[in-house]
Amino acid sequence: MSKHELGFYSPINYQVVGYINGVLCVKKYIAAKTEPIQIFLWNPSIRKAVEIPLPRIVQSGFDTECAFGFDPITNDYKIVASLYFHGENYFLKFVEIYTMSKNSWKFLETEKCPSLLDKHHPKTYLDGLIYWIGIDPIENTPKGKFSHLVSFNVDKEALNYIDLPNCEIFGGTNHERFPIIFNRSIAIMDIYFEHTNIWARENNTWAKKYTINLRLFQKYVYLKSDGNLLHCGEQGGVNSYNLESKEVNVVAKSYKFVPSFTGCYMESMMLLNGFDDRNVFTFPNG
């Protein structure tokens, strides 16, 4: 197996849900982009994909969000699907969990789920846990709009909540907050219009590790394990910012498309043998 930087330039009707062990979870939309018509796991290195049956909660008029995880205890992949009323960003209605080995979905009790989640922000997987951001219905608080970190234990199928550090501004519209992997641990990226903060979890508290004086709002791409942060350049292309030296270098002068998903890809032979009871296909087929 070998590792590569992976940039995924998806057509408008495809979304990468997540990536684990050489396998990407991909969701395909119909033209209206509200109802997924296909969910599949894809191994780009061998161009093999396996179709996942749709969760029972998928229906017209609702948005279905997915998260991708791996259970290291049972060596099994799982997908978490959550349903929202179309146009409503935060209020969760139903949750289903797909288990790869069983090829089936089951409902998660809704009272165990947070009522407020931000469906638009990315999810991050690390060491058997899926992380995403929770929402505070009262935005003008010290924590701001994004109030807590939600984690889902893939093995135990249980949710946990961690309060996030206070924001420095209240009610600001130019603010992004999402989980990242930093030094092999979960961390938080706080992006404002003029600067960005990186918070790490240490001894059950949040510690601000870096302040980056760059305009990264809607320009952040990926934080590499070597401490180089990739972001879109002011004139197009992709730049690299080193957290320690603060040096900025041009990685690519221009890109035809902005990557919709970026990660460290590891080649593997997963999905090579296929499954007797599932639709395995070549992707892309051209």
Question: What is the predicted function of each stretch?
Answer:
Residues M1-G286:
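Short, conserved recognition motifs on repeat-domain binding surfaces
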